UniProtKB/Swiss-Prot annotation:
GO CC list: cytoplasm
Domain of life: Bacteria
Location of this chain's protein in the cell: Cytoplasm
NCBIfam families listed in its UniProt record: aroA (TIGR01356)
PROSITE patterns for this protein: EPSP_SYNTHASE_1, EPSP_SYNTHASE_2
Binding, 3-phosphoshikimate: K11, S12, R16, S155, Q157, D302, K329
Sample GO molecular function, one term: 3-phosphoshikimate 1-carboxyvinyltransferase activity
InterPro entries xref list: Enolpyruvate_Tfrase_dom (IPR001986), Enolpyruvate_Tfrase_sf (IPR036968), EPSP_synthase (IPR006264), EPSP_synthase_CS (IPR023193), RNA3'P_cycl/enolpyr_Trfase_a/b (IPR013792)
Name of protein: 3-phosphoshikimate 1-carboxyvinyltransferase
EC code(s) of this entry: 2.5.1.19
Organism: Helicobacter pylori (strain G27)
Paired cysteines (S-S): none
Pfam families: EPSP_synthase (PF00275)
Binding site for phosphoenolpyruvate: K11, G82, R110, Q157, R333, R385
Length: 429
């Protein structure tokens, strides 16, 4: 059994810890922060808004919030981070000042009307490019009034932006989504003194009566990052793996449950139940079978590219449906998955909200065929999850990835850990 502490702090929790600290009044401590490019964008924006950030240890910070959020004299650069842009939009909607949020070409092409509409329901003054569809976003902070909103999509980022505005609005606001999305925002904010109640699937959010409590958070390992190595184990014969200190929030382990249904042996060992459930995950290789995925999409949307690799090793036709939001990520992930697999000669096809993949009962003929020519070049589309998913496939097939460096957005240690996996040894530090 190989033990692996991937030392890849959870991306969702890292973002939220930084952003929520701005609603506190006293210094907050964030330990084991994810030093990926996305989370560093949130940290830099906090500094631009007046927070004092001090490095206290490796990957750990003391964040002293400003007495009042400062109006910046420059654009707030979210780079490639949709979480930064959407959550800061909610936070800043009620703050005094003018704020402009922008990002790289990829982020500025991603849909933003999904947060502009609910924020406008509060009376927020927010504008986006091309009739509010895209960033850059301009926000003129103003007083907000409570509202009720039913989201047409299940999105933790949309929900979080709404909650951050609701905490600063006059009156109690209500939020409903058609499917449960990640709930870290509700869990963290409630632990810090926010009044957020779930009434029959409807979130009731009361305005803050006082600043959030100061906190000292240690971030657990990211299940989305850990899943890449669960996939590696699942497709590598005779392999067994122990992933340590992983966040086991039920809204974050759906991909592991899907892999389990496909035939992989997966067990959880809970180590603590404090703010979030944290524990270890045991994975053992076993033959995989095809699967159809059309439910709980919001809980596994980020892992679907990796699951597509598992589907390649699963006998029969696997299907993904109701996942249209994959087209609005860092790349069109439906197109990215299918075009790369087709380039390898795999039978697959895309449709508007998903794709199908005809799995291979035996991958060795494909490996032999590819070994007789120059390794195919996988197109990452500069999307970290596409790059890492197909990098795992290099464990079984001779491939090259055009830009594996984009993994640094969410998982800076990925390339090194993958090389260690190939050698059969790990050191997550």
């Amino acid at each position: 059994m190989i033990e692996l502490d991937i030392n890849a702090s959870d991306k969702s929790l890292s973002h939220r810890a930084v952003i929520f600290s701005l609603l506190a009044q006293k210094p907050c401590f964030v330990r084991n922060f994810l030093m990926g490019e996305d989370c560093l964008s949130s940290l830099e924006i906090a500094q631009n808004l007046g927070a004092k950030v001090e490095n206290t240890a490796k990957n750990s910070f003391k964040i002293t919030p400003p007495t009042a959020i400062k109006e910046p004299n420059k654009i707030l650069n979210c780079n490639n981070s949709g979480t930064s842009m959407r959550l800061y939009s909610g936070l800043l909607s009620a703050q005094k000042g003018l704020f402009v949020l922008s990002g790289d070409n990829s982020l500025n092409a991603r849909p933003m009307k999904r947060i502009i509409e609910p924020l406008k329901a509060f009376g927020a003054k927010i504008l986006g490019r091309e009739d509010n569809h895209f960033a850059p976003l301009a926000i003129l902070g103003s007083p907000l009034k409570a509202c009720d909103y039913e989201s047409p999509i299940a999105s933790a980022q949309v929900k979080s932006a709404f909650i951050l505005s609701a905490l600063q609005a006059q009156g109690i606001s209500a939020y409903k989504e058609n499917e449960l999305s990640r709930n870290h925002t509700e869990i963290m904010l409630k632990s810090l003194g926010a009044d957020i109640q779930n009434q029959n699937g409807v979130l009731m959010i009361s305005p803050l009566e006082k600043p959030l409590e100061a906190f000292d958070f240690t971030i657990a390992n990211d299940p989305s990052s850990a899943f890449f190595f669960a996939l590696a184990c699942a497709i590598t014969p005779k392999s067994r793996l122990l992933l340590k200190n992983v966040l086991l929030n039920p809204t974050r382990i759906e991909a592991f449950e899907v892999l389990k249904k496909m035939g992989a042996s997966i067990e959880y060992a809970i180590q603590s139940k404090d703010l979030e459930i944290i524990g270890d995950i045991y994975i053992e290789h076993a033959p995989l079978k095809a699967i159809s995925i059309d439910q709980n999409i919001a809980s596994l949307i980020d892992e679907i590219p990796a699951l597509s690799i598992a589907m390649l090793f699963a006998k029969g036709k696997s299907m993904v449906k109701n996942a249209k939001d994959l087209r609005s990520k860092e790349s069109d992930r439906i197109k990215a998955v299918v075009s790369n697999l087709k380039a390898l000669g795999i039978e697959c096809e895309e449709f508007e909200d998903g794709f199908y993949i005809e799995g291979l009962e035996d991958i060795s003929p494909l490996k032999q065929h590819l070994s007789q020519k120059k390794p195919p070049l996988i197109q990452s589309f500069n999307d970290h999850r596409i790059a890492m998913s197909f990098a795992i496939l290099t464990l079984a097939l001779p491939l090259e990835i055009d830009n594996l460096e984009c993994a640094n957005i969410s998982f800076p240690q990925f390339k090194r850990l993958l090389n260690q996996f190939k050698k059969g040894s790990f050191n997550g530090n």
